[in-house]
């Protein structure tokens, strides 16, 4: 509602979401550009499609959201192109596994423009040009940005909590922050990777649910511990289901 007021507490749990990454590029504020993170974002995109009947879309980003968007827009009969800087979709997967996803997307008519850097957006002929470095622009009736998320930790920062990777909230294994009686859980907390033991930012529903239960148990006098996230995730695109857990080859090599 926008109302501001003060509230006292004995124990406080922060559970902020991750927010869509907004690139600082020319034209990012055009009215034919969208991001998708919340239910309201979904309604906004759906309303635009119902009102304007776009025939084509460019999706910037080839992660979970980008792939699921591509499938849904293809089901509506739209021409869909995914563009991103990495040369493979779904970075958590090894390249040889991602190649199967590439084939599945192409089989269902999704165009892939991989290894291209987006430099901005311009309106033209009733649509949007996606400007690429050293390449001809991609033109579409609408563009959806799905290039990742970052922690929404404005409140945590203002409160003076210790922050970590990408501004995430640092917690211990009891989900306690650097300030006594304040706990944090969910997409915006820094965790330990279960396999490597390194600090990580893993925004997934399963770990967030478990962290909430652990924080609640500790607030109620228990002694529950969060031992880390494995990064287990699964996606279904068209007729293929793909899953990943632990670390991929590149992460394993980096961790030694």
Spans of features found by a protein language model:
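Glycine-rich dinucleotide-binding loop and its adjacent helix/turn
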Residues: 11-76, 111, 165, 171-173
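FAD-site-proximal beta/loop scaffold in flavoenzymes
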Residues: 29-53, 129-131, 137-218
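Short helix/loop segments within enzyme catalytic domains
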Residues: 221
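Short glycine-/acidic-enriched loop or helix-start segments at secondary-structure transitions
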Residues: 23-25, 69-70, 123, 153-156, ...
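A Rossmann-like FAD-binding core segment of flavoenzymes
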Residues: 1, 7, 75-173
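Flexible loop residues that form catalytic
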Residues: 17-18, 62, 122, 148, ...
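Rossmann-like dinucleotide-binding cores of NAD(P)H-dependent redox enzymes
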Residues: 56-57, 64-122, 202-208, 224-250
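Cytosolic Rossmann-like ligand/nucleotide-binding regulatory domains
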Residues: 253-256
